[in-house]
Amino acid sequence: MNDRALQDDVIRALADAPYRASATWRGRELADAGRVERFARFLARHFYHERIVHFFKYSRALARVTARLPEAVLRQPGFDALLSTAVLGERATARAVARLVMAYVAGEAVPYHEDLLRYQEAMMVVEAGPRVWRDTSRGDDRATVAHPPPELVEGTELLELEYDLPTVLPQLLQPWTTPPEAPRRKTSLIVARSRHGRVAVARASDAIASVVRFADGARTVDDLARAAGLRPGEIAATLRDLTEIGAVRFSTGS
């Protein structure tokens, strides 16, 4: 094993608890297992502290009425237990951490808090997962008749909420004495991430939500247009916008 491979192996062990516990890693005997475990857990706490503070910033602002800071979950037994299976940056681990936060800060002090928690969870989970660090693709992804069937990008989430959260989110981060109110009306949001890790949120009309639900890589653009009730120009524009935010891509088949 060369120096680069050795370095990669150590980094993987620090980030991947199941690998750290494997016979493959332990058999290498590269470092004291106890010290590696302690350092790995330190890194995990730092990694998820940053993400919780960032993605659950709205619940953090509401701590004035809930008396629960989201990042305090890092000191709870549930998070300690999770560390034995955690893989830093993986979607499954991000979802598990987000669920711990949701359970910890949940309450009825703010009517729309449940919607808010789901929104923040989606942001944290969608941000996780592998990235494309160097773009080697050629051409563009604009929706044209030459494209194969579009499909939903893995990790994209369609949120159907009871409250219009986008109207209240900026207010939550401003000074207030009583929590700002959110209009109670059905709201659909698409949360998606580009291949390079940029997370975007967009409102979704019923037609756009239909496109997201039915874009499975099997239905053609015409099929999606009929399902959503969109004209050719409208479906092309919709797919172009969804592709731009990373919600949809065009399948190339197998």
For each predicted feature, which ranges?
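Long, charge-rich, low-complexity alpha-helical segments
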Residues: 1-144, 194-254
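Short secondary-structure capping micro-motifs at structural edges
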Residues: 142-146, 175-178
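Primary mode marks residue(s) on the alpha4-beta5-alpha5 output face of response regulator receiver
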Residues: 148-150
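Low-complexity, glycine/alanine/valine/leucine- and proline-rich hydrophobic stretches
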Residues: 154-216
